[in-house]
């Protein structure tokens, strides 16, 4: 992995959950440790997280498609906040980028912020050990 500059890791919401509900802390801590090992070698890591442990699309025809998508986005943000805190407990710096304002817990996604990740090809983010946890941006109908 010494020559790999950047990795994107996709974590489904369902993968984060225990069968009986709640988060699988042992698994998430293990993922955080593995990510830290990669970051410590100088590789930039972006994490995309799903919300499927809370919400799997529109389950009721009485719910508008747009509202169902918004519920999914909120579920994803909850997962991002949780995973971010586990990553921080392992010594990683995190930022949560979302497509809409969500208080001080997240940063609004913008093209400029996305370019920060692209610039990492030229300027290493290694010093900050920055892990960007991005909500999967869904198409709104």
Residue ranges of model-derived segments:
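Charged helix-capping and loop-helix junction motifs
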Residues: 24-29, 109-112, 136-141
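Short active-site-proximal "capping" loops at secondary-structure junctions
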Residues: 52-55, 102
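Loop/turn-to-beta-strand initiation segments
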Residues: 42-46, 120-122
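Short glycine/serine/threonine-rich phosphate/pyrophosphate-binding segments
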Residues: 17-19, 54-58, 80-81, 130-141
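Anion (oxyanion) recognition and catalysis
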Residues: 39-40, 88, 118, 136
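Ligand-binding beta-strand-loop-alpha-helix segment within the catalytic cores
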Residues: 62-123, 129-130
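Short beta-strand segments
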Residues: 8-12, 49-50, 97, 124-127
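N-terminal glycine-/serine-/threonine-rich phosphate-binding loop
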Residues: 1-44
